[in-house]
């Protein structure tokens, strides 16, 4: 036995331990689920490593978890014969949180126990959940393939530090002993532990065993002798891979508990799909849509993907090759009969079997979402609130499924008068006016800016619906989604409005006449504004506002410019087209001005007003204020 060393917990571990004890007190029994789940993972890892090194089994290939309790001592012990840990592994895994985005996780905590418990659950507490019920935790572990005298003893009271020393342990694997708090001694009861195992761990694919006491010899009802039986370790769970069982035999509760096992989420899944595929490729998949987005969904370093099994043997976590990035929220597993047991991430990358499975699984998930949207609109809105912005990445990433993804998108609309994104493109098409051939939309900084944009005035007057987009990703989305079901998506802030048959002959004639009559005014404004605009035109889209700016058909939009600037990207100079409304009193009075200097000032003021309305900011706000003050002063004389 080596000299004992004391190590301090990583700061984040101290925070997590404190938060757990104070936030998860209402669901204490999850400690057993977490520790059994970890033990099962250790067995999976050993099985995988033993594929290339059978000696790691050390003559004991029957993998299992054993749980025992000592009422007198007030202890619970969870023991496995899985892969075990080395000394360095113990210090790394039981003293730190090696997760990217950990600091961000702690920032998101609110201090409200119910909310924080959900967030902590998403983060995944694993081993540290032991301290919810234990005043001290003792871990004895030996890594597979290491000598008996290279085992490690780890111990901590969950305060600020832990001790580590080298010990001798005859068998490989990990043994965790919880020294229960005085008010948690209920967990040192065999029947209590059995009920928790049945509730949370029935789906674990290796036996979770508890000691079954033997019985002495006794007399039977007819005076015959019933022989004594010896005690033995009895499996408390079904110990078969849940995904290999018949769907009709699996309860919703079992599916939900399995979801929590593989995802380490504390909340139920929103929906799931369990399928066996036969044909050119043979595989089983069990896919879950979570009910809540993980706290680190937008973290670029976050690992995602399905658990991969080959012929029931665990191969790897986070096999991202089977799921496109825009579906990275999907949890679950895939079990293939066709891939080799020695498959690596590199082999998966360019494998035709992988690509075929990815295509099939992607279609399966999209089908799940389509069915949910059709059968339960309220539940689909719950999904959209959590994952809608991620799904919007789809049209750019997955050309083959672009139309299906587009059908799943939801937007706010002038039809509903609400900021809630509840309108699908199919809803929009079903309400299109007779003769309407385009789907009209606007992208702005906020819902209010979109809903109140002057670009909508004529369309509102005609009762034509406009989709209102205000998320950062919407401009990116719309650049890759130009049509849906042969209907072109058309921005009301770009190029010509193009109402087509929605504009009758009389309106067209009136518009042409107005443009002709206003030609001298337009030329004067062009001269006044010079190089600050690409063009000046009579508007066809305004009814109540004097002027607006419009992006040219081939030019970069205002929102895309903002996105690129925010990302520190160089942005080309884009000059707007300035549209004026000659019917507005301000513009008609402007036309009457004979003083060309005053005319130029008023023209510039109208332009900057329009730019402020469109962009929400100006390149030189102080110049705008100076000009406005100058104009106010001149008119207050």
Curated annotation (Swiss-Prot):
The record's region (B) falls at: 346-562
The record's region (A) falls at 1-345
Q: Which SUPFAM superfamilies does UniProt cross-reference here?
A: ATPase domain of HSP90 chaperone/DNA topoisomerase II/histidine kinase, HSP90 C-terminal domain, Ribosomal protein S5 domain 2-like
**Classification via CDD domains:** HATPase_Hsp90-like
**Gene3D superfamilies per the UniProt record, alphabetical:** 3.30.230.80, 3.40.50.11260, Heat shock protein 90, C-terminal domain, Histidine kinase-like ATPase, C-terminal domain
Principal place where this protein is found? cytoplasm
Localisation: Cytoplasm
User: What processes in GO biological process is this protein linked to?
Assistant: DNA damage response; protein folding; response to heat
Q: What SMART domains does the entry give? A: HATPase_c
Q: Which GO terms describe its molecular function?
A: ATP binding; ATP hydrolysis activity; ATP-dependent protein folding chaperone; unfolded protein binding
What Gene Ontology cellular-component terms does the record carry? cytosol
Q: Identify the PROSITE patterns for this entry.
A: HSP90 (PS00298)
Q: Which residues form the signal peptide?
A: none
Region annotated C sits at 563-637
Quote the InterPro entries the UniProt record gives: HATPase_C_sf, Heat_shock_protein_90_CS, HSP90_C, Hsp90_fam, Hsp90_N, Ribosomal_Su5_D2-typ_SF
List the keywords (alphabetical). Answer: ATP-binding, Chaperone, Cytoplasm, Nucleotide-binding, Stress response
Q: Which family does it belong to?
A: Belongs to the heat shock protein 90 family.
User: Subunit arrangement?
Assistant: Homodimer.
Report the protein's function.
Answer: Molecular chaperone. Has ATPase activity.
Protein's name according to its UniProt entry:
Chaperone protein HtpG
Q: Which organism is it from?
A: Shewanella oneidensis (strain ATCC 700550 / JCM 31522 / CIP 106686 / LMG 19005 / NCIMB 14063 / MR-1)
The taxonomic lineage of its organism, from the top, reads: Bacteria, Pseudomonadati, Pseudomonadota, Gammaproteobacteria, Alteromonadales
